């Protein structure tokens, strides 16, 4: 991370490195530094060093969708009336053209494209807002650099949003009752965003986060777009706002990003841009791991530790995120055994949660011998520790439950002690109770359901056709982690264990 304090020495090495990478665009970046040196403003010069020095890994990609032959496929998320229709349309495309995937067409490094005019305007306006608005008075220079100054929030196209919102929302300063309260200012801004922008799940299939111009045009987006929009509007007024995210929920499918504000007491208060204000927002599912997006390069991030030949799983492959799990849950440290064999040339073990039909990595550690220690993880979750080899998750041990008391309970199928079980649901959310408090089955009559148990992979334990009552399975290995899936589903069903009474316990 490039220092964000008073500088007494020559141009930092990381800045020099980026200037060399900039190639033909180096004169633009050099002129930003020269501009503030000539102006004699040490703080703005330091701000320029912060942005340029941390620019190395920032940029955005333009994608295109291709089929199994590599031929480009025309696809627009807004061509479908709703998310279910989009998923059906995607399935229909894959049936006709084979597997679909987004491929990078062009990647634009920030150090190749940002102009001196853009950088200077961004720094000047950020600095002006920091000094103008009383609600930013509690920020030190390092907090200003991280939570106000950056010209981008994630991997979206670079656009001039700061001037737009600085002018558009100038009325907020006259509307707040307490001009020293950044949270009140954030509420005014968020109410403005809520008046015209909406969440739309179709944007789950949009290949990138949107830039401001696209959001102003469509007025729709996914959670990452909503957090970015709030960051644009609020940072333009020097309201210190950030984006936190969980790579994958621990007890349901998908992931999530949301906003947080650094209030005047230096406490972090969460909210959802365009949806729920600070003090009103609650996360809807279980957290195993939480990270905060940063502009500054995090030296302890996974990409900074990997050897050149090593790959990182999705979401952990960023060096501009930092772990803030302990801010959200009573995080614990867990030790696990690596007893499934260790692939060659692998230096890290990963902790995975089960999400949308797959084990997905949410944390990492450098292992020692046949032991691995993961720090700061959420309890009350089913985990699998694994390796990332050939860009695939490879089990490193048995799945386990990390209990609320931080005990590790391994889930090892016992084929010598087989049981008969009856099941009422594929997920916790659709389990019903009748008026006499007896459990009611919730299946699609006539549909085939497959019961799996985990033993280094999902092994089939039996099939059943749904009627009106529960599903019955016999001769099932006991003590395992189970997964009941409707044939042909999108694999959003949840995993479970069985308690001493044979009832499903959901994870």
PLM feature segments, named:
Residues 159-164, 197-203:
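A structural motif
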Residues 5-186, 236, 265, 288-507:
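N-terminal accessory/pre-domain segments preceding catalytic cores
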Residues 175-192, 203-213, 219-313:
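Hydrophobic/aromatic-rich core segments of domains that either
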Residues 25, 193-197, 263:
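Sec/Tat-exported extracytoplasmic proteins
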Residues 1-2:
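Sec-dependent bacterial lipoprotein signal peptides
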